[in-house]
Amino acid sequence: MIREGRVSIASRIVREPEHPTLETEADIRVDGQHFAKPVSRYLMLNKPRGLVTTTHVERSRDTVYRCFDDSDMGWIAPVGRLDKASEGLLLFSNDPQWAARVTDPATGPSKTYHVQVCGIPDDAALHRMRQGVQDQGERLTAVSARMLRVGERNAWLEIVLGEGRNRQIRRILQALDFEVLRLVRVSIGRVALGELAKGAWRELSADEVAALVGD
């Protein structure tokens, strides 16, 4: 479309797809008609275990987009990620600027997880999680780690992260010799998963959208 000369910016034909412009500030037209900016969408999904988090639909793998099969909302992308074996709160949006603010490791919101582990961590192990462990040349720490409930052979922990490194919780627990049985993200900042059913999604409220970027 662009290379065919059908797109103009500020009354000038543009043929380079990577031509820099700010969509909100330029007069963009396609075939002489004003380009309508898509409505911004902000969603939360209760991701089921076993689905791959990816930025596009793939026929060869079972991805999170399966949960949106019955909807017609246009392009959206995950904001952050959960690995295939993890479940819980996953955000989606078609607003890349908002997504970048949410996922900024320096200023983005904290993330809270409920984690079932094989074995019973003692106070010293919980302290190590907060103090940090070394793994693959990285120091991995939790903002907080506390016991939720204890069974005969396993326990549920609540772990809060201030930054999201790849498989961070699994790596911390592996370094302390605990096997992760389940890992569920229950909140991001002040936005909680609540009673949203597994595999279901809903729109974020305006207050939730603002809260996730500190507005």
Predicted regions and their residues:
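Basic, flexible Lys/Arg- and Gly-enriched helix-loop patches that mediate nucleic-acid binding at interfaces
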Residues: 1-215
